[in-house]
Amino acid sequence: MGKIILTGDRPTGRLHVGHYVGSLQERVKLQNSGDYDEIYIMIADAQALTDNAEHPEKVRQNIMNVALDYLACGIDPAKSNIFIQSMVPELTELTFYYMNLVTVSRVQRNPTVKAEIQQRNFEASIPVGFFCYPISQAADITAFRATTVPVGEDQLPMLEQCKEIVHKFNSVYGETLTEPDIILPSNKACLRLPGIDGKAKMSKSLGNCIYLSDEAEDIKKKVMSMFTDPNHLRVEDPGQVEGNPVFIYLDAFCKQEYVDEFLPDYANLEELKEHYKRGGLGDVKVKKFLNNVMQAELAPIRERRKS
């Protein structure tokens, strides 16, 4: 059996830098490695409707936005198969059959589902489709016989549930489905990029994103407004690097060439961190450096998207 990748995104808005470091960079690397026989990248419009059923136009419009973001980041249609979920109706049929193999209590225990229900303030008014979307994801993965699924850290519970469905199905109907392996981002700083407000996760619904298509001035405004160490009130105060969103972003995006170009007084990023920790380095200077880094990373993506 060949090596097959299945991955994708919900078209509920433009993609942001959390998607970029969390999955898109990894997809491009895997695509260009030549190690896989097939790569399928799904624009999950049917899944997007599970919490946007009253806003179908939003989903419809963002299908193209997501496709443009893919191409701008380096997804190559000659190497990767980009498709729209709703155009493969068999996925919905397979989801229905899998629903008979999963209990309500098991879905309720899924940490990702619980977190997203809380984030959307659904409480008791959870749409059934949204509640069951881990089952839909399992159908997507197994329908294409995916052997590998690149995911962010927050999606690990979904993949575990998929594996449970595979085991259950195979125990009842015989060895039919393929259990997928998981690939996490190789850069550990990218496992979960926080929002610019310091919240645990960057999210379109929370409005705390830097989008891949943001203009230069929008990026600057967002970076300069970023949450940082609340106890670092004066330049001379020692600052906290661990858990500080500005430094998390630098860990995810900064390259040595950016330090050499934008901060020639420092040998490397670690030296900048040590200066911040002992005091004498203001947040504004660090944010200006981060802005330069983000501009250098995102300008080529933005220009490719426009072309």
PLM features per residue range, with description:
Residues 23-30, 162-165, 249:
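Buried hydrophobic packing segments
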Residues 37-40, 45, 142, 148-149, ...:
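Glycine-rich phosphate/pyrophosphate-binding loops
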Residues 111-115, 119-173, 194:
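Internal, conserved structured core segments that host functional sites
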Residues 2-139, 296-306:
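N-terminal Rossmann-like or analogous alpha/beta NTP/dinucleotide-binding catalytic cores
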Residues 70, 98, 154, 199, ...:
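Divalent metal-coordination and catalytic microenvironments
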Residues 157, 163-307:
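Conserved nucleotide- and phosphate/pyrophosphate-binding catalytic cores
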Residues 21, 57-60, 152, 156-160, ...:
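Short, conserved loop/turn and helix-capping segments at secondary-structure boundaries
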